[in-house]
């Protein structure tokens, strides 16, 4: 309705915001947007002794001593039960595009990640997938979406990169740069 999003999108869609905050979850978009901690402005917490604390403020910057708010984030319920949250939302990017970069093996895929991050592409997410996962998914769904042999070469691992933004042309420019980087770092079929 307001075209806003909560960036630390947890992979588990049945998860709660309280659980998300209790574990300081990051989700796939943490690469670009950070983790839950970056989006919690305030919370109400019930301590084990029954005391109710109102922590934080509905503004981003505060400097009034220790941050009990940030101590609660990621404490997994050991310090108290979160009953209310005030979260920061950001404008939802209008466009996104995802790429699967296949590599010969796990080492090649893993070594590609820092190069992609350092290229200034500002990826929304970078995910690693082993060949076994791709094969298992294809067997389970009966649909082989991701190729395992590219130009006669076996892919042993994959990197899934998502780029997002508000300007489609700018995203396509970053996508071209990603394809060039893919060629330089040994990705198949970029």
Feature-to-residue mapping (PLM):
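Noncatalytic alpha-helical scaffold of FAD-dependent oxidoreductases
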Residues: 1-190
